[in-house]
Amino acid sequence: MYRINLTTFTLLLVLAVGSLMSESLHPSDGAINDLYEYLLQREYAAPVSYADHQIKRKAVRSPSLRLRFGRRSDPSVPLRPEEDELIDQKAIRAPQLRLRFGRNDPLWTSFNENALLEENFEKRAPSQRLRWGRSNLFGNLVNQFQQDDVMQQKTIRAPQLRLRFGRTDPSWAMYNEHQLTTGQQAQPANEASEKRAPTQRLRWGRSDPALAKDSSEDKALDVEESENTNADDK
């Protein structure tokens, strides 16, 4: 009797465990449908998290966004008249300063607006150029106030002492002008065709102005000596 009761209890236990295992392997259709509906809802705050992976569904996009095949709007939704008016009334933008790769400089947006105003300004006067194309600031101010006088009363400048590579020594400019005016006053009209006295040449064909005066004095002494000799011979 005891053996029969033990065998019956064992069979009942095996059947109970088998039924539980079969239910866990084959869930009901209701649980699957609930999970499917939960995943297909329109929006939710957090993604559905599982132990081995994650599933996240995006919210439904509005029809104004770009759809398939490059369409900007849903063909079933009509366009608003405000957008058409804005497209028709869109003005052509002014040309802007282009940077590399077609970018625009935001600092130069008002450049074209002021371009017409800058054209009305007077052009700058020609300035005295220094070495390497630099301009003399003092010369610019003088040209701005005396532009007409300089252009009308411009005369041929006197020969100046040239330095190396064609540069001019400004300290000799006034000296050469003074020498030129005094020489023109001292020379008589009949000696205009007389050749100048040979002077000692410096480097690059320059003449020493200090020796020019000495050569003229020597020539005058030679003339006086020749006259004295002619008088003695007579």
UniProtKB/Swiss-Prot annotation:
The keyword Secreted applies. Its main location: secreted. The keyword Signal applies. Residues 23-56, 207-234 form a propeptide. The modification Tryptophan amide is found at residues 132, 204. One of its GO terms (cellular component) is extracellular region. Coiled coil: none annotated. Expressed in all body parts of larva, pupae and adults. GO terms for biological process: neuropeptide signaling pathway; regulation of multicellular organism growth; regulation of response to food. It is found in: Secreted. Keywords: Amidation, Cleavage on pair of basic residues, Neuropeptide, Secreted, Signal. Transmembrane segments: none annotated. Residues 181-234 are annotated as: Disordered. Belongs to the NPY family. Plays a role in controlling food intake and regulating body size. This is Short neuropeptide F. It comes from Anopheles gambiae (African malaria mosquito).
